[in-house]
Amino acid sequence: MTARQNTRRMNRLRQEFFEEGRALDADPARRKESLCWLCAGRIDYSVGQGTTDESHELDHVVPVSKDPSLQEEWSNFRNSHRRCNRERGDRTPLGDTGDRVAAWW
């Protein structure tokens, strides 16, 4: 596998994704789509990307270290807080596995 590459195309995609998140945050009807996918908290889009713990940072659902071919894949992008993204690192997030069943089951 190859390492993450910081290409012009990736920088442009990162900026476009940030702008889309900021536009969604400005629209109360669609704000939920701009929240941090890891903690569901509101992201501070008024500051530069990655400048504070509460600022926006593009996160990859499937970490680039696990599948570099998805680095520039829009469907692999998620809005996150810088802090949440850094805490997660390159681990795959634990998702909900479905409906809960009774403890006696």
Q: What do the predicted segments below correspond to?
A:
Residues 1, 102-105:
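Short intrinsically disordered terminal tails
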Residues 1-41:
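Short, charged surface segments at domain edges that flank catalytic/cofactor-binding sites
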Residues 29, 48-51, 93-96:
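Short linear functional motifs in flexible/disordered or boundary regions
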Residues 33, 70, 100-101:
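Acidic, low-complexity intrinsically disordered regions
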Residues 44-45, 76-102:
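Short Cys/His-centered divalent metal-binding micro-motifs
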